[in-house]
Amino acid sequence: AAAAAGLRGAAAHGYLYGPRARNFVAAEDGVWWQSPDDPTVYPQKESCPHCVNQYRAPGYCGLTQDGSKEYTVPLDSRGAPIESPPLQATLTAGEPTTIGFKLTAHHKGHVELGVCCDAQPSQACFDRNPLTFQQDLLYGAPVDAAHPERGYVAPRAMGNPNIGDGQSPGGMGTGEYGNAMDFRMKFRLPAGVSGDRCLIQWRYITGNSCEMPGYDQVAWPSQAWRNAGVGTCALPLSADGSGAPERFWNCADVKVLPAGS
């Protein structure tokens, strides 16, 4: 299990745990130090897997808030790039899969996912291949026909009312990564994308500083799920995660079988 040292009070929001994102793998499996005689490839230890909220172009998997780790090219415990990070799941093109993530600070909003199986992944590749939201397994968030890629974040009162808002000092609470709200959603992979080595990109788009277009049309469970009054986000959003709304990126290494396999 990952160490909890240094996590209290961090400005952090969430992470993908199913399938495990690279930053969460580094938290669970990484080491701070290993003998130079040990040939095992361990990821570089991550103490804040829920702090990956920007990226440097041409990156696409997230940059830690202190700028020390860029998960587009994860590093091993010796600081060398990990060329083939271990696969975390085998999925099937065109089929639904369950996505699990936790929010350690609840900023409303929604999540989106994309898949890329190119040898040289790019943000454009993820954008071309979005997963489609099918079902919220825990809280019953609705499918949005106008924005089928969105999985809306349930109000924190429906899950963990003790989760922080990310602004008050007590927001992190206790536990390995602080109080967290668990989410499990079904998303369907696009039918025409498969490969032995692919990336699932998870994006959390917060809704506390501005609202993405269309939020006012989602009356679930009432308009209390959103932050009405904060104004509409200016489009297009910045490519690197700067400015509003605050966003978080994670990537998970997976294999995607062809449709019908």
Model feature map: region roles:
Residues 1-2, 38:
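Helix-centric, low-specificity signal for extended rod-like, repetitive segments
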Residues 13-260:
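Structured recognition/catalytic domains enriched at protein termini
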